[in-house]
Amino acid sequence: MFLTSVLILCSLAALSLGQKNNNFAPGRNTIVHLFEWHWDDIANECENFLGPKGFAGVQISPPAENTVIGDRPWWERYQPISYALNTRSGDESALASMIRRCNNAGVRIYVDAVFNHMSATSGIGTGGSSCDVEPSASPAVPYGSGDFHGRCTSNNYQDPNNIRNCWLSGLPDLDQSKDYVRDKILEYLNHLVDLGVAGFRVDAAKHMWPADLQVIYGRVKDLNTDHGFSQGSRPFFYQEVIDLGGEGVSKNEYTGFGTVLEFKYGTELGNAFQGNNALHNLENWGPAWGLLEGTDAVVFIDNHDNQRTGSGAILTYKNPRPYKMAIGFMLAHPYGTTRIMSSFSFDYNDQGPPTQGPGFNSVRNLHQWVGGANTGWRQILRVMVGFRNAVDGTSISNWWSDGNQQIAFGRGDKGFVAFTLAGDINGNLQTSLPAGSYCDIVSGKLENGSCTGKTVNVDGNGQAYITLSSGEDDGFLAIHVGAKV
């Protein structure tokens, strides 16, 4: 009996640990969220840019059918009406094709999975299904009123029962303790695993009981080996648990069976790179700041929600210089699994994605997309994703600061970065890099053996002469062994 119990516990521990494995292909380290992109466009991006440039994965918008709402706001994607795979991003056939093409390009797909709730808006869905909020009925699943928690408003963030059993923003709250509800959620998740996805961002995980989620995750299938995953590989789960401290639900409740989106990360870096906290304080960046252990955390500067509704601490594409610097720091630092944002420009918070033409099946307007077709953003994202890949497996070394708003650090003998928010850096800094000339990948690129930007010389003692002006557009430089002149 004792041996059986031990074996069961070991099996559960292995299962939970596997759900923290991001399933990246070797040599790749960063997820990009292609928010509201069409499936066909994502497939092309995987083949033509993300795969060749070393990106590890794509987080896609919710693929489940949602209610069609008024002016088609972005948030209608978070109002599921069924688990049919039919949205304005494309149908199931297009989704399946995209997943296969991206996997073939070495880029994994992570689904934004919404199963805390169903739609708060009665009406017709993107695939023609219907729902009625008043009796809490989603006949296309089907769910009936008995599958939901009783109506109450989620408004007391000191009370875990209120947070997890009441309706968030009027959204009918599913009861994940019920076997039937679990089974319907599992049908949805397992179908996506069959199609070849590598994992899930779990929307509103904070509003579901950890014990229920642990059961659901544990019953999701192993990943599909037809898509290049090793036998027995588990889906990667990263959970939306907004925890900035002082509430009744803690992010630590969710780390036993998956990773967690670390919201404190972007808030603190946003403050730092806007000059509200001196950069030199980042020397001990990580759990000492109240962050999760790095193996438990998926980190980001901004997301689709707080781009629009976040505090002044949140950096977005609308604050280009500090935003790029914060992204650069995130991708240069070894902490956490990194995720970057590719969104669209917007003038008001509810604004949906751009198109050319009268319907959402028309070709998207590339000029309104940020981090995709916009070549300036592609440059920063591409080179720093490449930097992270080049320095993988190394730790922080040779930390330097001026005691205020200038910092620099190495990644072992593989790379080195420097940042300034105030004043110029002109002088020798210690690195662990081999002697030679290196191309600053932020100001230029290595092309036919020459650097189109700054060249940084490292002597035989590892000393690098760094010149970085506080007036430069990007505010930082980066060199690594893969960009040696």
UniProtKB/Swiss-Prot annotation:
Expressed in larval and adult gut. Binds 1 Ca(2+) ion per subunit. Ca(2+) binds at N116, R164, D173, H207. Residues 1-18 form the signal peptide. Its cofactor is Ca(2+); chloride. The record marks D305 as: Transition state stabilizer. InterPro entries: A-amylase/branching_C, A-amylase_C, Alpha_amylase, Glyco_hydro_13_cat_dom, Glyco_hydro_b, Glycoside_hydrolase_SF. Its main location: secreted. It catalyses: Endohydrolysis of (1->4)-alpha-D-glucosidic linkages in polysaccharides containing three or more (1->4)-alpha-linked D-glucose units. One of its GO terms (cellular component) is extracellular region. GO terms for biological process: carbohydrate metabolic process; digestion. The active site is at D203 (nucleophile), E240 (proton donor). Keywords: Calcium, Carbohydrate metabolism, Chloride, Digestion, Disulfide bond, Glycoprotein, Glycosidase, Hydrolase, Metal-binding, Pyrrolidone carboxylic acid, Secreted, Signal. Disulfide bonds join C46-C102, C152-C166, C439-C451. It holds the Pfam family Alpha-amylase_C. It is found in: Secreted. GO terms for molecular function: alpha-amylase activity; metal ion binding. Glycans are attached at N448. The modification Pyrrolidone carboxylic acid is found at Q19. Monomer. PANTHER family: ALPHA-AMYLASE. This is Alpha-amylase. It comes from Phaedon cochleariae (Mustard beetle). The lineage of its organism: Eukaryota, Metazoa, Ecdysozoa, Arthropoda, Hexapoda.
